[in-house]
């Protein structure tokens, strides 16, 4: 389910998702499990006659959780059965004509995660920070 509000210079979108995996021992799902999550995405676009023409500042806040327990044989749908996570991402973007450059900064935190199934070289770190730089041509 998605809803978008658009009133320049703002675009705000929210969504909710739900998934379900039924019990199926043939694939190792000895208990049914599901995920549910949601996000809010907000984007501010600077006007062409502003001091920052071509600049957009998107921000995304997300949450997802899974149900079930490892003891009952639930499948791992996230960071272990019954785990959850939230994240925030900022993606400043500049576009000139058909050329763009975009940076992305993201932070995620896992909650009620199973040790060894999360982040880092041993899978035991409950948080992760990432950065990325992208540039390209739109066609």
Show the residue positions of the predicted features:
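Outer-membrane beta-barrel pore domains
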Residues: 1-139
């Amino acid at each position: 389910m998605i809803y978008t509000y658009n009133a320049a210079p703002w675009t705000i979108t929210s969504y909710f998702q739900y998934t379900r995996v039924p019990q199926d021992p043939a694939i190792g799902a000895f208990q049914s499990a599901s995920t549910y999550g949601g996000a809010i995405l907000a984007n501010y676009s600077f006007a062409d006659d502003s001091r920052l023409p071509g600049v957009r500042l998107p921000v995304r806040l997300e949450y997802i959780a899974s149900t079930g327990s490892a003891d009952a044989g639930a499948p791992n749908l996230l960071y272990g059965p019954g785990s959850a996570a939230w994240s925030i991402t900022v993606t400043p973007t500049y576009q000139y004509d058909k050329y763009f450059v975009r940076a992305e900064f993201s932070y995620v935190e896992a909650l009620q995660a199973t040790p060894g199934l999360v982040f880092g070289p041993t899978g035991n770190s409950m948080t992760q920070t990432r950065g990325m730089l992208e540039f390209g041509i739109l066609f």
